[in-house]
């Protein structure tokens, strides 16, 4: 049976804006209050996804969340009509309104952690939505995320959906952005790397001083248990707290893996050599550990360009390619390194550049925009086929974006009652296009 790694990219929602909500994410903070272009953002995301589909990759799309989130605003005491709720929030608590309008679900690397059936004791594909408790604007996502994942991977014979972890900082979980999987072939049992920022229950363990560590060891271990992984299938690695304090808020900003390749910065981890040795012990295959030295690419350049927030994909030919943002081309040190990388003896043979600037300005590169799901042929056939990106779906989604999305959105526009109507109309139509059923609060 054939095995694949599919990518499920997040559709950018109609309220994509720059409110600077993500403390610890340098790009998000630096671009706060810029005027955004939701239409361009959605089309850039679709274009990147379609390019991967055209390369022969299995590519799916995940629907965005309902925003503005009036349910949350009502839950915290705003009342009256939809327009009155928005007006009150804008006047007395604009930061809360901004949080309830974020289109951050576009970064599906934070949607969930996924373990393929080759790794799990029950032979099913397991999904656990991330609780994202560290950030208010993301902590309101998990319930709808779970519904969207269940409507996308909708055959219980193949797919097992867990609830998100308890909503407490001890179980802070940011999903696949802190998880990668190494293997020989996608269908073989692999080693799942869980990267965490701190041990919540150990006050003496190292942790960052300036920015929060969003992922805890306790959360990573809970997911490994839920997903029925054996100890031999797991390696738990602490991210270097010093790089978290330099803006590396998720591991996918400083490392990325695919099959037998781990591409990472010299400063990415604590106890790096011991952990690489553990991976070698647990995964008996030829491995390529590509360590990028600080002397060639500084942490600052890595964060600014999102060198590691790239996708490494295995093309149908068997060669690997890096999917990089154009920001990597524009950074001399990073561009020079990527050109050098192609001359090294590794499976990575090409770099393809994509413009995802609307996402990048909010602190999310190509890897943030996708959730990886390793699947066999039967599992691919069991997915809701209306979520897989074909030429027809690409055209339909582009037309849908053109019809419903604004090309200009400022934070002041978030209080416009018309935005609620536009957003709900768009999402209602999207659930019909993608055959998702009633996943949104306004539909229930």
UniProtKB/Swiss-Prot annotation:
Active site residues of this protein: 174, 250, 368 (nucleophile)
Cited Gene3D superfamilies: Succinylarginine dihydrolase
Protein's name according to its UniProt entry: N-succinylarginine dihydrolase
Catalytic function, reaction form: N(2)-succinyl-L-arginine + 2 H2O + 2 H(+) = N(2)-succinyl-L-ornithine + 2 NH4(+) + CO2
NCBIfam families in the record: arg_catab_astB, PRK13281.1
UniProt keyword Hydrolase, yes or no: yes
Entry-linked Pfam families: AstB
Organism from which the protein derives: Shewanella oneidensis (strain ATCC 700550 / JCM 31522 / CIP 106686 / LMG 19005 / NCIMB 14063 / MR-1)
Listed GO MF terms: N-succinylarginine dihydrolase activity
Pathway assignment: Amino-acid degradation; L-arginine degradation via AST pathway; L-glutamate and succinate from L-arginine: step 2/5
UniProt record similarity statement: Belongs to the succinylarginine dihydrolase family.
Domain of life (superkingdom): Bacteria
Chain residues that bind substrate: 19-28, 110, 137-138, 214, 252, 362
Subunit-structure text: Homodimer.
E.C. no: 3.5.3.23
Record function comment: Catalyzes the hydrolysis of N(2)-succinylarginine into N(2)-succinylornithine, ammonia and CO(2).
GO terms, biological process: arginine catabolic process; arginine catabolic process to glutamate; arginine catabolic process to succinate
Keyword list, A-Z: Arginine metabolism, Hydrolase
